[in-house]
A protein has these predicted regions:
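Short amphipathic alpha-helical interaction segments
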Residues: 57-72
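Short acidic, hydrophobic short linear motifs in intrinsically disordered regions
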Residues: 27-55
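Short alpha-helical segments that sit at the start of domains
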Residues: 1-37
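Core residues of bacterial helix-turn-helix
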Residues: 55-56, 80
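Short, amphipathic alpha-helical interaction segments positioned at domain boundaries
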Residues: 94-121
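Extended low-polarity, hydrophobic cluster-rich segments
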Residues: 10-23, 66, 94-103
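Short, cationic-aromatic polyanion-contact patches
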Residues: 32, 81-103
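A short, conserved structural fragment
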Residues: 71-81
Length: 126
């Protein structure tokens, strides 16, 4: 069976959903837009570059490409601390993934199922 091709857009989707999970919020809760600033201020939630690499299940090159794209789009901030990277989602990142998760689910359904075939589908895909 041929491997299903995944591009950096779907990897960005995986990374953003991982960052939302680190915040511990319900992405679809009512009134989220009004709460985002307070949530981001109250919680020091971040993931490492290694955690992003693990989530997207790809190599160092693709991990860097994904992080750089998310940073360029304003969806994350990246802080280097003692040789390690702390990646945090921004308000724009939360609003983007909330708006486009349904689109990603429709367009990339085969790739998402393939990506999570051994771990089980993530909460945001169900």
């Amino acid at each position: 069976m041929a491997e299903v091709y995944k591009d950096s857009k779907i990897y960005c989707c995986f990374a953003l959903n991982r960052l939302v999970a680190a915040l511990g919020i319900d992405l679809y809760q009512e009134g989220l837009e009004a709460k985002i600033d307070a949530i981001l201020a109250d919680r020091d939630a971040f993931v490492s570059k290694e955690e992003i690499k693990h989530e997207i299940r790809s190599n160092h090159y693709m991990t860097n490409k994904v992080v750089e794209q998310l940073l360029a789009d304003g969806f994350v901030t990246v802080e280097a601390v003692e040789g390690r990277y702390r990646i945090r989602i921004t308000k724009a990142g939360i609003l983007h993934i909330r708006k486009y998760n349904e689109f990603y689910r429709r367009i990339y359904a085969e790739q998402i199922r393939d990506h999570y075939k051994y771990a089980g589908l993530p909460y945001w895909f169900r």
